[in-house]
Protein backbone atom coordinates (compact mmCIF):
# COMPACT_ATOMS: atom_id res chain seq x y z
CA UNK A 1 0.00 0.00 0.00
CA UNK A 2 2.99 2.34 0.34
CA UNK A 3 5.05 3.64 -2.57
CA UNK A 4 8.64 2.50 -2.87
CA UNK A 5 11.50 4.61 -1.57
CA UNK A 6 9.20 6.56 0.75
CA UNK A 7 9.73 5.79 4.40
CA UNK A 8 6.40 5.94 6.17
CA UNK A 9 6.26 5.21 9.88
CA UNK A 10 3.19 4.66 12.04
CA UNK A 11 3.19 5.20 15.77
CA UNK A 12 0.40 4.60 18.27
CA UNK A 13 -0.47 6.45 21.42
CA UNK A 14 -2.26 4.66 24.23
CA UNK A 15 -5.71 6.15 23.53
CA UNK A 16 -7.03 3.38 21.25
CA UNK A 17 -4.52 0.54 20.78
CA UNK A 18 -6.85 -1.81 18.88
CA UNK A 19 -7.77 0.78 16.25
CA UNK A 20 -4.08 1.63 15.81
CA UNK A 21 -3.22 -2.03 15.20
CA UNK A 22 -6.16 -2.41 12.80
CA UNK A 23 -5.05 0.64 10.79
CA UNK A 24 -1.48 -0.69 10.65
CA UNK A 25 -2.80 -4.09 9.58
CA UNK A 26 -4.84 -2.55 6.77
CA UNK A 27 -1.76 -0.71 5.53
CA UNK A 28 0.42 -3.80 5.89
CA UNK A 29 2.87 -1.91 8.08
CA UNK A 30 4.20 -2.49 11.59
CA UNK A 31 3.62 0.02 14.35
CA UNK A 32 6.82 1.80 15.28
CA UNK A 33 8.62 1.19 18.55
CA UNK A 34 7.93 3.94 21.08
CA UNK A 35 8.16 3.92 24.84
CA UNK A 36 5.32 5.68 26.66
CA UNK A 37 5.49 5.72 30.45
CA UNK A 38 3.92 7.58 33.36
CA UNK A 39 6.01 8.90 36.21
CA UNK A 40 4.78 8.47 39.76
CA UNK A 41 3.40 12.02 39.76
CA UNK A 42 1.38 11.38 36.59
CA UNK A 43 3.71 13.07 34.09
CA UNK A 44 4.05 11.42 30.67
CA UNK A 45 7.39 10.24 29.28
CA UNK A 46 7.97 9.44 25.59
CA UNK A 47 11.02 8.02 23.80
CA UNK A 48 11.13 6.72 20.23
CA UNK A 49 13.17 3.51 20.17
CA UNK A 50 14.00 3.72 16.47
CA UNK A 51 15.20 6.38 14.07
CA UNK A 52 12.53 8.54 12.46
CA UNK A 53 14.90 10.91 10.67
CA UNK A 54 13.48 11.86 7.27
CA UNK A 55 10.35 9.74 7.80
CA UNK A 56 6.79 10.51 6.75
CA UNK A 57 5.45 9.93 10.26
CA UNK A 58 1.86 9.37 11.37
CA UNK A 59 0.95 9.43 15.07
CA UNK A 60 -2.45 7.88 15.82
CA UNK A 61 -4.02 9.10 19.05
CA UNK A 62 -7.65 10.04 19.71
CA UNK A 63 -8.16 12.62 22.44
CA UNK A 64 -10.97 10.63 24.02
CA UNK A 65 -11.43 10.13 27.79
CA UNK A 66 -9.24 10.60 29.73
CA UNK A 67 -9.13 13.62 27.42
CA UNK A 68 -6.39 15.68 29.03
CA UNK A 69 -4.09 12.68 29.52
CA UNK A 70 -4.45 11.58 25.90
CA UNK A 71 -4.05 15.13 24.61
CA UNK A 72 -0.83 15.79 26.52
CA UNK A 73 0.52 12.41 25.43
CA UNK A 74 -0.16 13.32 21.80
CA UNK A 75 1.59 16.67 22.16
CA UNK A 76 4.65 15.01 23.68
CA UNK A 77 4.67 12.36 20.95
CA UNK A 78 4.64 15.11 18.32
CA UNK A 79 7.32 17.16 20.05
CA UNK A 80 9.65 14.16 20.43
CA UNK A 81 9.08 13.28 16.78
CA UNK A 82 9.91 16.82 15.65
CA UNK A 83 13.10 16.85 17.73
CA UNK A 84 14.05 13.50 16.14
CA UNK A 85 13.99 15.14 12.67
CA UNK A 86 11.02 13.46 11.01
CA UNK A 87 10.41 14.95 7.57
CA UNK A 88 6.64 15.32 8.02
CA UNK A 89 4.46 14.70 11.07
CA UNK A 90 0.76 13.96 10.68
CA UNK A 91 -1.36 13.80 13.83
CA UNK A 92 -4.20 11.31 13.31
CA UNK A 93 -7.05 12.00 15.72
CA UNK A 94 -9.97 9.63 15.10
CA UNK A 95 -11.78 11.62 17.80
CA UNK A 96 -11.02 15.31 18.39
CA UNK A 97 -11.67 16.19 22.02
CA UNK A 98 -12.81 19.67 23.09
CA UNK A 99 -14.66 20.06 19.76
CA UNK A 100 -17.86 21.13 21.55
CA UNK A 101 -16.08 24.19 22.92
CA UNK A 102 -15.80 25.83 19.50
CA UNK A 103 -17.51 29.14 20.27
CA UNK A 104 -18.40 31.45 23.14
CA UNK A 105 -21.95 30.86 24.34
CA UNK A 106 -21.50 32.97 27.46
CA UNK A 107 -19.23 35.81 28.57
CA UNK A 108 -15.66 35.04 29.66
CA UNK A 109 -15.55 31.53 28.19
CA UNK A 110 -12.59 30.05 26.34
CA UNK A 111 -12.77 28.86 22.73
CA UNK A 112 -10.93 25.69 23.64
CA UNK A 113 -11.17 23.98 20.25
CA UNK A 114 -9.15 26.84 18.76
CA UNK A 115 -6.60 26.53 21.58
CA UNK A 116 -6.18 22.80 20.88
CA UNK A 117 -5.65 23.52 17.18
CA UNK A 118 -2.96 26.05 18.11
CA UNK A 119 -1.10 23.76 20.51
CA UNK A 120 -1.12 20.86 18.04
CA UNK A 121 0.53 23.14 15.52
CA UNK A 122 2.94 24.61 18.06
CA UNK A 123 4.04 21.14 19.17
CA UNK A 124 5.22 20.39 15.63
CA UNK A 125 2.36 18.78 13.69
CA UNK A 126 2.49 19.47 9.95
CA UNK A 127 -0.91 17.99 9.18
CA UNK A 128 -3.99 16.64 10.96
CA UNK A 129 -6.38 13.85 9.99
CA UNK A 130 -9.60 13.65 11.98
CA UNK A 131 -13.23 12.61 11.56
CA UNK A 132 -16.68 14.15 12.01
CA UNK A 133 -15.81 17.24 13.99
CA UNK A 134 -18.62 18.57 16.16
CA UNK A 135 -18.63 21.75 14.06
CA UNK A 136 -17.26 22.09 10.53
CA UNK A 137 -15.97 25.58 11.40
CA UNK A 138 -13.23 23.99 13.54
CA UNK A 139 -11.38 23.23 10.30
CA UNK A 140 -10.75 26.96 10.03
CA UNK A 141 -9.00 27.02 13.41
CA UNK A 142 -5.97 25.28 11.90
CA UNK A 143 -3.16 26.99 10.03
CA UNK A 144 -1.92 23.62 8.75
CA UNK A 145 -3.66 21.20 6.35
CA UNK A 146 -6.51 19.21 7.88
CA UNK A 147 -8.22 16.20 6.31
CA UNK A 148 -11.77 15.86 7.63
CA UNK A 149 -13.14 12.34 7.21
CA UNK A 150 -16.75 11.31 7.76
CA UNK A 151 -18.44 8.06 8.74
CA UNK A 152 -21.65 9.03 6.93
CA UNK A 153 -20.91 6.72 3.98
CA UNK A 154 -20.37 3.78 6.33
CA UNK A 155 -23.74 4.43 7.95
CA UNK A 156 -25.40 4.68 4.53
CA UNK A 157 -23.92 1.32 3.49
CA UNK A 158 -25.04 -0.22 6.78
CA UNK A 159 -28.65 0.87 6.40
CA UNK A 160 -28.80 -0.01 2.71
CA UNK A 161 -27.94 -3.57 3.71
CA UNK A 162 -30.65 -3.56 6.40
CA UNK A 163 -33.23 -2.43 3.81
CA UNK A 164 -35.49 -0.69 6.31
CA UNK A 165 -38.85 0.50 4.99
CA UNK A 166 -40.51 3.92 5.24
CA UNK A 167 -37.40 5.58 6.65
CA UNK A 168 -36.97 9.22 7.66
CA UNK A 169 -33.54 10.74 8.35
CA UNK A 170 -33.49 12.90 11.47
CA UNK A 171 -31.00 15.63 12.28
CA UNK A 172 -31.40 16.36 16.02
CA UNK A 173 -30.34 19.98 15.47
CA UNK A 174 -29.41 22.47 12.78
CA UNK A 175 -25.70 21.63 13.12
CA UNK A 176 -26.05 18.18 11.51
CA UNK A 177 -28.39 19.17 8.68
CA UNK A 178 -25.65 19.26 6.03
CA UNK A 179 -24.55 15.67 6.71
CA UNK A 180 -28.16 14.54 7.18
CA UNK A 181 -29.09 15.88 3.73
CA UNK A 182 -26.26 13.86 2.19
CA UNK A 183 -27.56 10.74 3.96
CA UNK A 184 -31.04 11.61 2.67
CA UNK A 185 -29.71 11.49 -0.89
CA UNK A 186 -27.83 8.24 -0.29
CA UNK A 187 -30.85 6.47 1.23
CA UNK A 188 -33.52 8.24 -0.84
CA UNK A 189 -35.47 9.18 2.28
CA UNK A 190 -37.14 12.36 3.61
CA UNK A 191 -35.59 14.64 6.22
CA UNK A 192 -36.76 15.86 9.62
CA UNK A 193 -34.90 18.42 11.73
CA UNK A 194 -35.09 19.06 15.45
CA UNK A 195 -34.45 22.43 17.03
CA UNK A 196 -32.58 22.30 20.31
CA UNK A 197 -32.52 24.63 23.26
CA UNK A 198 -29.42 24.07 25.35
CA UNK A 199 -29.36 24.68 29.07
CA UNK A 200 -26.28 24.72 31.29
CA UNK A 201 -23.95 21.69 31.30
CA UNK A 202 -25.63 19.38 28.85
CA UNK A 203 -29.38 19.57 29.54
CA UNK A 204 -31.13 19.86 26.18
CA UNK A 205 -34.73 20.39 25.15
CA UNK A 206 -36.01 19.99 21.60
CA UNK A 207 -38.50 22.80 21.15
CA UNK A 208 -39.69 22.02 17.61
CA UNK A 209 -39.52 19.38 14.88
CA UNK A 210 -39.67 20.21 11.18
CA UNK A 211 -40.72 17.34 8.93
CA UNK A 212 -43.21 14.48 8.94
CA UNK A 213 -42.23 11.42 10.98
CA UNK A 214 -45.67 9.93 11.61
CA UNK A 215 -45.66 6.20 10.91
CA UNK A 216 -42.05 6.30 9.73
CA UNK A 217 -38.89 4.55 10.94
CA UNK A 218 -36.43 7.25 12.06
CA UNK A 219 -32.68 7.14 11.59
CA UNK A 220 -31.06 9.78 13.81
CA UNK A 221 -27.67 11.05 12.61
CA UNK A 222 -25.33 12.51 15.25
CA UNK A 223 -21.63 13.23 15.51
CA UNK A 224 -21.29 11.96 19.09
CA UNK A 225 -23.18 10.57 22.05
CA UNK A 226 -21.89 11.59 25.47
CA UNK A 227 -24.47 11.29 28.27
CA UNK A 228 -27.24 10.35 25.86
CA UNK A 229 -29.44 13.19 27.08
CA UNK A 230 -29.85 14.90 23.72
CA UNK A 231 -30.58 11.60 21.97
CA UNK A 232 -33.18 10.57 24.56
CA UNK A 233 -34.83 13.97 24.19
CA UNK A 234 -34.87 13.55 20.41
CA UNK A 235 -36.39 10.07 20.76
CA UNK A 236 -39.09 11.46 23.07
CA UNK A 237 -39.97 14.16 20.54
CA UNK A 238 -40.12 11.68 17.65
CA UNK A 239 -42.41 9.33 19.58
CA UNK A 240 -44.68 12.26 20.49
CA UNK A 241 -44.93 13.06 16.77
CA UNK A 242 -46.08 9.53 15.96
CA UNK A 243 -43.05 7.73 14.55
CA UNK A 244 -42.69 3.98 14.73
CA UNK A 245 -41.13 3.00 18.07
CA UNK A 246 -38.20 1.42 16.19
CA UNK A 247 -35.70 4.25 16.19
CA UNK A 248 -32.19 3.72 14.83
CA UNK A 249 -29.37 5.99 15.98
CA UNK A 250 -26.01 6.41 14.28
CA UNK A 251 -23.26 8.48 15.88
CA UNK A 252 -19.62 8.53 14.84
CA UNK A 253 -18.16 8.95 18.31
CA UNK A 254 -19.46 6.87 21.21
CA UNK A 255 -18.13 8.82 24.18
CA UNK A 256 -20.85 7.23 26.34
CA UNK A 257 -20.20 8.67 29.79
CA UNK A 258 -22.12 8.03 33.00
CA UNK A 259 -25.11 5.69 32.42
CA UNK A 260 -25.53 6.47 28.71
CA UNK A 261 -25.27 2.86 27.53
CA UNK A 262 -28.04 1.71 29.86
CA UNK A 263 -30.28 4.67 29.06
CA UNK A 264 -30.01 3.87 25.37
CA UNK A 265 -30.14 0.08 25.61
CA UNK A 266 -33.14 0.07 27.96
CA UNK A 267 -35.27 2.57 26.05
CA UNK A 268 -38.21 0.70 24.49
CA UNK A 269 -38.40 2.95 21.40
CA UNK A 270 -34.71 2.55 20.47
CA UNK A 271 -34.02 -0.39 18.17
CA UNK A 272 -30.27 0.05 17.69
CA UNK A 273 -27.37 2.42 18.32
CA UNK A 274 -24.57 2.33 15.73
CA UNK A 275 -21.22 3.89 16.64
CA UNK A 276 -17.67 3.57 15.32
CA UNK A 277 -14.44 2.50 16.99
CA UNK A 278 -13.00 6.03 16.89
CA UNK A 279 -13.22 5.67 20.67
CA UNK A 280 -12.65 2.27 22.30
CA UNK A 281 -15.79 0.63 23.69
CA UNK A 282 -14.94 -0.88 27.06
CA UNK A 283 -16.28 -4.41 27.70
CA UNK A 284 -18.47 -3.13 30.53
CA UNK A 285 -20.17 -0.73 28.10
CA UNK A 286 -21.16 -3.35 25.54
CA UNK A 287 -24.92 -3.86 25.25
CA UNK A 288 -27.15 -5.84 22.85
CA UNK A 289 -28.47 -2.72 21.11
CA UNK A 290 -25.04 -1.15 20.55
CA UNK A 291 -23.27 -1.99 17.27
CA UNK A 292 -19.72 -0.81 16.57
CA UNK A 293 -18.36 -0.32 13.04
CA UNK A 294 -14.65 -0.03 12.32
CA UNK A 295 -13.08 3.06 10.75
CA UNK A 296 -9.67 1.38 10.37
CA UNK A 297 -9.94 1.01 6.59
CA UNK A 298 -11.05 4.63 6.22
CA UNK A 299 -8.10 5.97 8.19
CA UNK A 300 -5.74 3.52 6.52
CA UNK A 301 -6.83 4.73 3.09
CA UNK A 302 -6.51 8.38 4.18
CA UNK A 303 -2.98 7.79 5.49
CA UNK A 304 -2.07 6.00 2.26
CA UNK A 305 -3.40 8.90 0.18
CA UNK A 306 -1.60 11.54 2.23
CA UNK A 307 1.64 9.60 1.87
CA UNK A 308 1.06 9.31 -1.89
CA UNK A 309 0.06 12.99 -2.27
CA UNK A 310 -3.36 11.90 -3.50
CA UNK A 311 -6.74 13.51 -2.86
CA UNK A 312 -8.41 12.58 0.42
CA UNK A 313 -11.62 14.54 -0.10
CA UNK A 314 -12.42 12.48 -3.20
CA UNK A 315 -13.16 9.59 -0.83
CA UNK A 316 -16.34 11.39 0.21
CA UNK A 317 -17.27 13.55 -2.80
Label each region the model flagged:
Residues 1-317:
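PRPP-associated nucleotide enzymes
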